[in-house]
Swiss-Prot record:
The gene is cobS. It comes from the Bacteria. Pfam families: CobS. The chain crosses the membrane at residues 31-51, 55-75, 109-129, 135-155, 183-203, 227-247. GO terms for cellular component: plasma membrane. This is Adenosylcobinamide-GDP ribazoletransferase.
Amino acid sequence: MTPFWIALQFLTVLPIELKTIPTAQQNGRAILFYPLVGLIIGGILFLVTCIFVKLPALLLAAIVLALWIWLTGGLHLDGLADTADAWVGGFGDKLRTLQIMKDPSCGPIGVLSLVIICLLKFALVYVLIEQHQSLFLICIPILGRVVPSILFLTTPYVREKGLGRSLTDHLPKTASWIITGFVLLLPLYWGWQGLIAIIGFLISLVYLRHVFIKRIGGITGDTVGAAIEIGETVLMFTFVVSYFYLV
């Protein structure tokens, strides 16, 4: 179960202590448990909506989003901000883009990207709560956590060192594809809405993958984080839009 604890420690702020330093092989296997960690995150979010169901939807949406960000430690938001800064500041140059991504400071474009994504997520969470579709909150982090598998399975990792390199070199490919395929079927519980949400989600990943390859020749940890945030938002958006047009 060590890979599971590695995944839980990496993807959340939950107090997990590992007895030994993870090996590259364990890091690679940990990615198989990312969707399970997503289930834990989503389950907590849904539980909160059930406990505080009597609160105004606006306030509850703010609580859910704040808890969501806290649970993940803002890990993927950090990747989004770094990617946004690098994409604008890199002026189309691969090396400059990669260099800016390594800068720990957050520029104005990075801040703007965080504001936009958080506003969108807040509005979408609010609509889900208001329309009594809070159960879908469980599904969102699960699908978000298969984004790394999809990208690492299909896209070159451009840095020579780091956690991403371990994941790329030691990811169990067959098991990862099976888990990814199963997870992508989960939204079908919601019928046509779920199917449209899956399609929108996958289209966003295909587009982001194309953009990443065109600019830097592949992916980095930051771009994967950005893809998780954007993918989750597109998933929610397409689900909400289809809800109003199909119901």
